[in-house]
Amino acid sequence: MDEKHIENLEESLGGYKEKILEVNKGTLEWDRDLIFKVRTQMGYEIEYDANLQWGCSPTETLLTSVAGCMAIDVFYFLKKMKADIKEFRINFTGVRRPDPPQYYKSIELVLNISGTGLTTKKLDRAISLSQNKYCSVYNALRKDIEVKVSYNIKDI
């Protein structure tokens, strides 16, 4: 992939990165027990439950947010690089510290992608752009968290 193509790739991000809200707002209300309901400014709802019976934990949503943010970036970049993606899945694992604050000490993301026109060079570039420049969630993590990203390509 030449430098001109990479510049065009980054310029094309205007399609979805321009829609990012500079200020995000929402509300969180206690529902019952240790269950809280969140409503985003766009009207989406999430339930947090410390006991994990009625909703996910805040740390789970952090982990899913890292995977989701990277997925959107990588998928978008690969499409711009003319890859025809048939399947895209990220398996993720987070290992937390046992003592408070029990933040993630390591996160592993394994991208499983199948399609045509997929190369390691394209995937490495898409992941690099996401990690180093575009994934807001990834870049909001503590710097001492070890994040490992790998992938499996199935060219069909």
Task: Describe the residue ranges of each PLM region.
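Extended beta-strand/beta-hairpin segments
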Residues: 1-64, 75-156
